[in-house]
Amino acid sequence: MVVTMRAALRLMLISTVSLELIIGILANVFIALVNIIDWIKRGKISAVDKIYMGLAISRTAFVLSVITGFLIAFLDPASLGIGIMIRLLTMSWTVTNHFSVWFATCLSIFYFLKITNFSNTVFLALKWKVKKVVSVTLVVSLIILFINVIVIHIYTDRFQVNMVQKCGANNTLRAYGLFLSISTVFTFIPFTASLTMFLLLIFSLWRHLKTMHHNATGSRDVSTVAHIKGLQTVVAFLLLYTVFAMSLFSQSLSIDAQHTNLLSHFLRCIGVAFPSGHSCALILGNNKLRQASLSVIFWLRCKYKHTENQGP
């Protein structure tokens, strides 16, 4: 009975992860397509749409790399002990996750600079050059990625030496745990940047509401609504990214347990929620994407009713 219950829970968790991955692919492909079609129609693309498109493309690549890793672990687990396979999987995961997270961080920075109002000279200079700020942020992130790749490369080489000296599944698990630990450390950099944007947005909103109160003006003006929308976008990223980072950290701590246990599947389940859930939150929070999604849903409903009417 206990075995049956464990098997049912395991199947449920695996099904949940699979559903999250499918939603992640669909949501991110949708975001990319909407922005590409709009770009073709208008002949130009805004800075924020570029960020959305870059985020969607990198997220799609990230989810595909996760799916590839899961399939290899399921179909040919022995290959995970091969050095070149470990290098390919870790590098693809690292690069795609890096751009996925940093594009989301750039989105937080963009909203912060566009929405908030501070009289500081440095802030005003950054506000007028928001595109350059985003570009510089991405360049800095490339330097961080380079360091991250070097660190992983060094430890992958050490792992290959250990594999020659003593083989076994424990070595593969330790290498995986070490990779997760390194990834967790590097995730705190963009997380800290987004958290800073979040706190400054709250401070800016508080100042704005205080000014509105002194002037005896309604609190639901354009600036207030913009602040709240910006906060919603950043909060969605922070909450889901916190869950993602905690998932990575927890997996690195529980790495001595077998990969087939329920805890491992549960941690993967909550970790995969980040690239899927955040993209869905972006669709709901962006007027253009939300309208496009409603149009698609309406079209699918009409298509379904038309098919039903033509049925036997």
Swiss-Prot record:
This is Taste receptor type 2 member 103. It comes from the Eukaryota. GO terms for molecular function: bitter taste receptor activity; G protein-coupled receptor activity. Disulfide bonds: none annotated. The keyword Cell inner membrane does not apply. SUPFAM superfamilies: Family A G protein-coupled receptor-like. The chain crosses the membrane at residues 17-37, 66-86, 93-113, 134-154, 185-205, 230-250, 265-285. Belongs to the G-protein coupled receptor T2R family. Several bitter taste receptors with distinct ligand specificities are expressed in a single taste receptor cell. Gustducin-coupled receptor implicated in the perception of bitter compounds in the oral cavity and the gastrointestinal tract. Signals through PLCB2 and the calcium-regulated cation channel TRPM5. Keywords: G-protein coupled receptor, Glycoprotein, Membrane, Receptor, Sensory transduction, Taste, Transducer, Transmembrane, Transmembrane helix. GO terms for cellular component: membrane. GO terms for biological process: detection of chemical stimulus involved in sensory perception of bitter taste. Residues 1-16, 87-92, 155-184, 251-264 are extracellular. InterPro entries: TAS2R. Coiled coil: none annotated. Glycans are attached at N170. It holds the Pfam family TAS2R. Residues 38-65, 114-133, 206-229, 286-312 are cytoplasmic. It is found in: Membrane. It is a multi-pass membrane protein. Its main location: membrane.
